[in-house]
């Protein structure tokens, strides 16, 4: 043995440092896959969809062009695919491979956070080869490195529309930030907006993951797959395609409720339901209608009708629409106004034009 030989702990630190931008490599190295007597005795590694998501993170971080741009991952899925396990492995990698990493975890309800999401994070931390590096409590995981317990930590934080300060303080410049929204469909839009506004540190690795069953057809989680899909890396995962799910139970649901029922869409297929509680026309019908091609000759006989949604309440923009037979198009969309004269002038101008 030479003087330069590393101690087992020093060798571990060096090995783990090699996975700074490789969460899949870390997961395969750090957890006791296939080891008898452990909870992972019958598993050979992360599930396929988990490995794919880890590769997305790896590719984002290993590319200097994208490394310091926020990476936002959204996954809508049915039941039993291993969302909590993925979140737990992600957090353990993030904390173990970056000094003073900051992690914030929230969920749809305080009960979900305390009894499901966070206990799973603790379980995986205790399985990891780096378990002695951190202390876990009922609401936090922090570094045992002297003087780092306040800066190098993960916290379970219940959200409230009346108390969003916890998500406004997500600054960790030149380090790493991980934000986790579990069962994201039922986290209020305001919390999303506050969290988004905080992710502005430069030269910082920022990863935001939003997972859950697609229970609602409205809200920010839904818009990750629609209005903001150019910002989020999205996937919708059918539980029947994932290793380790109870295929018989899933098939019973399909048999009982039907493949196209909202129950199966939400709990099996990872697809958002057709209609929300505030929606009159199901999304499936409008999606089909928007794909149809209508020629000018087909609607030449029909009168031109102008429709107006002034959007006096709610968060949507005001809209002026034209309809002629089965043809329709947006004429104008913009900020709402309570000045009726301004809107009347806009409408009159379009009446003159058409």
What are these regions, as identified by a protein language model?
Residues 332-340:
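Short beta->alpha junction loops
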Residues 312:
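Primarily the active-site beta-strand->alpha-helix module of PP2C/PPM metal-dependent phosphatases
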Residues 2-308, 320-328, 333, 345-354:
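Phosphate/NTP-binding elements of NTP-utilizing enzymes
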């Amino acid at each position: 043995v030479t003087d330069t030989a590393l101690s087992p702990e020093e060798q571990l630190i060096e090995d783990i440092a090699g996975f700074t931008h490789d969460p899949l490599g870390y997961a395969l190295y750090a957890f006791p896959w296939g080891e008898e007597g452990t909870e992972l005795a019958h598993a050979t590694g992360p599930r396929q969809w988990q490995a794919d998501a880890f590769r997305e993170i790896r590719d984002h971080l290993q590319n200097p062009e994208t490394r310091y741009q926020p990476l936002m991952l959204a996954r809508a899925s049915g039941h039993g695919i291993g969302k909590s396990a993925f979140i737990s492995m992600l957090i353990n990698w993030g904390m173990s491979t970056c000094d003073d990493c900051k992690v914030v975890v929230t969920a749809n309800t305080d009960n979900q956070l305390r009894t499901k999401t966070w206990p799973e994070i603790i379980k995986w931390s205790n399985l990891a080869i780096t378990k002695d590096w951190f202390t876990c409590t009922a609401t936090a995981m922090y570094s045992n490195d002297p003087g780092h317990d306040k800066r190098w930590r993960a916290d379970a934080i219940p959200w409230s529309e009346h108390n969003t300060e916890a998500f406004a303080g997500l600054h960790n410049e030149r380090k790493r930030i991980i934000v986790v929204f579990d069962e994201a469909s039922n986290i209020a839009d305001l919390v999303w907006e506050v969290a988004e506004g905080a992710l502005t540190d430069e030269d910082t690795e920022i990863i935001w993951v939003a997972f859950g069953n697609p229970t609602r057809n409205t809200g920010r989680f839904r818009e990750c797959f629609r209005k903001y899909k150019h910002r989020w890396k999205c996937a919708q995962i059918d539980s029947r395609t994932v290793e380790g799910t109870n295929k018989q139970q899933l098939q019973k649901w399909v048999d009982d409720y039907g493949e196209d029922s909202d129950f199966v869409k939400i709990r099996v297929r990872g697809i958002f339901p057709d209609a929300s509680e505030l929606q009159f026309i199901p999304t499936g019908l409008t999606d089909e209608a928007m794909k149809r091609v209508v020629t000018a000759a087909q609607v030449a006989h029909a009168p031109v009708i102008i429709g107006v949604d002034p959007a006096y309440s709610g968060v949507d923009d005001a809209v002026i629409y034209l309809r002629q037979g089965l043809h329709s198009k947006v004429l104008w969309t913009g900020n709402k106004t309570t000045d009726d004269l301004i809107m009347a002038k806009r409408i009159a101008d379009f009446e003159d034009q058409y």
